[in-house]
Design a protein with these regions (language model features):
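Structural beta-alpha unit
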Residues: 1, 41-44, 52, 68, ...
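Small/aliphatic-rich secondary-structure junction motif
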Residues: 1-61, 141-144, 151-162
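Short alpha-helix boundary/capping motifs
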Residues: 9, 13, 17, 75, ...
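Short, flexible loop segments at the rims of nucleotide/cofactor-binding pockets, characterized by
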Residues: 12, 92-95, 124-127
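Generic structural signal for residues in well-ordered beta-strands
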Residues: 34, 92-94, 146
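A short acidic, glycine-rich active-site loop
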Residues: 58-75
Length: 162
């Protein structure tokens, strides 16, 4: 059976080039449609809203500037993925999920043959020991195989399934 759809999951604020490169490599090798899912969860921002409020309250214009900056970063990540897929001459689509990230990703996995995600994915401001809470929660209820990729891309030499 051939794969029909690979999902590559991205945090648009902390874009993983490794996830992009692994996803493109595998999609090209298997001639599979690649879907870049950008988890634009509205509850997750580059700034810590609670710290802003606690310090001085947040003037509306400052908040709008912070939101605009996040949008630019997320848009640049999606554009980088778009450009890389076009260069690789892949069949691909981009989904910008603006709901709760973990729920959307689990839903996307129902229709995927493979999900690719960075091992350090947290969708938080904090670094966590591996596997992260986000990854552990994702693995509990994913409906397809998951490839958790390292920080740096290296071409795949061999695959061992357990």
């Amino acid at each position: 059976m051939n794969m029909k759809k690979i999902v590559a999951a991205f945090d648009g604020l902390k874009y993983s080039e490794s996830t992009r490169d692994f996803a493109i490599y595998i999609a090209k090798q298997t001639n599979t449609h690649l879907v870049g899912v950008f988890m634009d969860d509205p509850t997750y921002t580059s700034y810590k809203i609670y710290e802003l409020i606690a310090k001085e309250g947040v003037p509306e214009d400052k908040l709008k500037k912070l939101e605009a900056k996040d949008k630019l970063v997320r848009d640049a990540a999606a554009e980088d993925f778009n450009k890389a897929c076009r260069q690789a001459e892949l069949e691909f689509t981009i989904h910008r999920d603006r709901d709760i990230a973990i729920q959307e990703l689990k839903h996307e996995s129902i229709y995927a043959d493979l999900l690719i995600i960075d091992s350090k994915e947290t969708l938080t401001h904090y670094t966590e020991k591996l596997p992260t809470r986000f990854i552990r929660e994702l693995l509990t209820d994913t409906q397809c195989p998951v490839l958790i990729v390292p920080l740096k891309y290296k071409p795949i030499q061999k695959i061992i399934l357990l």
